[in-house]
Amino acid sequence: MQFVNFTVALFTAFTMQARSAQQELPVLILSADAARDIKSEKSTDALLESSFQYSRRKADEVLKHPVTVPLPEDAGGGYTHEKHKRNYADMYHAALLFSITGDKAYSGFVGEMLLAYARLYPKLPLHPMRKENHPAGKLFWQGLNEAVWLFYSIQAYDLVKHEIRRKDRDRIEKELFRNMVRFISVDSYETFNKIHNHGTWAVAAVGMAGYVLGDKDMVERAVRGSEKDGKTGFLKQLDELFSPDGYYSEGPYYQRYAILPFMVFAEAIAQNQPELGIFEYRDNLLHKAVTTLLQLTNQNNEFYPINDAIKDKTYFSEELIFATNIAYERYKDADLLPVIRQTGRVSLTNAGLITARAVSRTEGETYNRIPMLIKDGSRGDQGGVALLRMPNASGTRLDALFKFASQGMGHGHFDRLGILLYDGDNEVLSDYGAARFLNVEAKDGGRYLKENKSYAKQSIAHNTLVADETSHYQGKVSEGSKNAPELLFSDFREDILIVSARENNAYKDVNMTRTVAMIAMEEAPDYPFLLDIFEADSDTPHQYDLNFRYPGQLMQTSFPYQRDQTLSAMGKNNGYQHLFKMASGKPGKGQATFTWLEGKKFYSITTLTDEDTELFFTQTGAHDPHFNLRTEKSYLIRQSGAKTHVFVSLIEPHGSFDPQLETVQNPDSEVEELRLVFEDEDYLVVSFRFRNRPAYLMALCRGETDEDGLHKLQIGEQTLSWKGAYLLTRKQ
């Protein structure tokens, strides 16, 4: 009922109560009062001062050069592409400096550049480097960049509009902004109404233009879609792209990118129509969107690189500066302040001013990342992501991400039930991310490379199970979008963090279940490890490949292997064609251990094997004539001809290597025993033992996983009785 009431109220507000942009200037996210306060307070506030100086350096630099607005020619990374990007950023910083200092040299620069664009834009055809079957722009090869240009430029215009002569203002608004709004919202109708980050940027840019130009129609189309019926537009984006927990369906990399237009446009709505309560929408969804996004980072503050992600992006990015500032302003969440302080800058906005004041009143603290289960899907029923985190002896943490989320639309990868693992600063089990060199013109104009589809999206490029060398859902987004994995159970305690999920639709006749447990044993609470149990079940025989992607250098194995002297690809399709077979071995029945060194620490994977198990070491680079793929390695466990199989692996950090002292400690795996001691239709029991420690049993329920279910099982002379979906206990 709340949703219906909000929609009705919104319609009424837009048709009857929307403010005219002529009533008050500026109308977006930096008011005249806030600009005056920033000017007066920055000398005594280090965060405001550093933020002001950051923009001042950029603005002063552009004043040294003439305004240049080139005819669009280049793809991403090329001169004209980058120049148009710099131009909107330059205008934005110059407009900020004018608002704070009152120096008309800055406003004059913005006005001159906007006039230059007003002369150019009406004459532009679609971009000459546009890509077939991809929404094109005029200034840029893709329409997305056009919306980003408007997003920043309309903010700059908002701050200097009253300084520009009426005649020039009319030309800028008619020839440039209204022309561009028409192109983005009418000529690019499909993108404008798409539930996707491209659509988010488009509606945010057009909506803010509507506020600045005093055009209620623009605002309403932006918020409720072109037909003004609420089936598309900003509110629908909030409804469909985020789960109730604030998880964005395309994953954290694109959540980082999209959070800027979501938060800034929401702030513009709140400034112009506070009665709409946009920041209370869907139970404070935008607050959860920011806090969940921050949690989706590792200890290097990098976003977990699932789906189409450029690795190394951190929460120090410009998008998060704005998003965290606005989130603090609106929700007064003190947990955000350590991130803002660490960033060292605030946005020069109303929100940035409020946030800087709050930071100055608090002591320095570190950002607290916690174990958590994050639901996916607009109703929270499309699987999710589990973050398992435990402190370790080195004063950092062992972090695991277990992905059992939905497809993630076109940017999603086929990595159902995939995992990532980090140990402090070290990436232990990695994800390739996206095959793209963003804005590097030499690499296909900075676009996604063809290897993104042929390798990076494929299941074998992830830490998950692959059947018959075929990717999940045959690598088809349309098929993958029909179903999501099912969460079976989860339990977060001090000594164990455990999550189990099932995927029954990725293959026609293979059911997959993965249970991931991070365990800190009583005898060694500061040395957590990962117990990974991956079950494959089918009525027909298959080849099952469980892949572990590892950085670092192989140190030793417990099994013999043969190094290939002549390199060949692991297969012909679905990403296998890009993997060189570097070495292989047959370990026989028992357990196989592989140890590698990454940074200054050793890591081992110990896995149960039998006579049919084959082990492979692979490396990217096959059938890659242009060296588009980074050189990365994998350890692949293959089980051939099996209908059902249980992969049981224990992944442990151990020891250290000090190149300065030339010392090595505990380079060998501590695992002495790993066994599957019981298995039937209802239960599965694994035993494991570390050197000089007692053995433990992990019992899992395969059928009833209700937390109140009672279970009893006899294992040898030991009777196991427990309540819930699992039991972890000492072996007697």
Tell where the protein language model's regions lie, with residue ranges.
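Catalytic and substrate-binding regions of extracellular carbohydrate-active enzymes
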Residues: 337-570, 643, 649, 653-656
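Short, hydrophobic/proline-enriched secondary-structure or compact coil segments at domain edges
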Residues: 500-502, 590-594, 682-690
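Extracellular polysaccharide-recognition and catalytic grooves
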Residues: 174-416, 420-427, 562-597, 603-609, ...
